[in-house]
Amino acid sequence: MSRPDENKNEHPVVHPIPPVYRADSRILILGSFPSVKSRETGFFYGHPQNRFWKVTAAVCGEEVPQTVEEKKAFLLRNHIAVWDVIASCVITGSSDASIRDVVPNPLQDILECADIRQIYCNGATAWKYYRKYQEKQLGREAVRLPSTSPANAAWSVER
């Protein structure tokens, strides 16, 4: 049971990072919502322990990009678009489990401009909210991938 004033100071956090894509993007990778660290750095998968950049670099046969500019160039060079399912929500820290009051991102903006052939969701939370808010509207199924978040301790790059 919650205390009456427990949620008093909670307010929606608005997604601060624009999507990365261009007309020749073929793959769209969706996260749920940026972590605190990503919001601080101003770019996707900003936590140093997040495995996203290591995994995508390995899949693409490239070195792991380090700077935001290198990461953007890497994504575009490999025809990868990146964004998140959620535009705003109430969230405690970076905890996906605490997400509520979701407003979805307008993913159709990317799909109308880019040659997206496959949509992937990075983790269960992104997939859950994609299916809830986007799948029917867009008429596109997404593939659920293991989360690259450091919170997903059961999964590693080596596996």
Model features per residue range: what roles?
Residues 1-26, 48, 93-104, 108, ...:
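C-terminal capping/extension of enzyme domains
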Residues 37-98:
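Short, surface-exposed acidic-centric catalytic microdomains
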Residues 77-126:
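Internal catalytic-core helix/loop-beta-alpha segment
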Residues 29-30:
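N-terminal nucleotide-binding beta1-loop-alpha1 segment
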Residues 37, 128-129:
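Short, solvent-exposed loop/turn segments at secondary-structure junctions
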Residues 54-58, 109, 113, 132:
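Residue-level signal for well-ordered alpha-helical scaffold segments within enzymatic catalytic domains
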Residues 50, 126-127:
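Alpha-helix N-cap/helix-start and coil->helix boundary motif
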Residues 34:
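N-terminal phosphate-binding or glycine-rich loops at protein starts, especially the Walker A/P-loop
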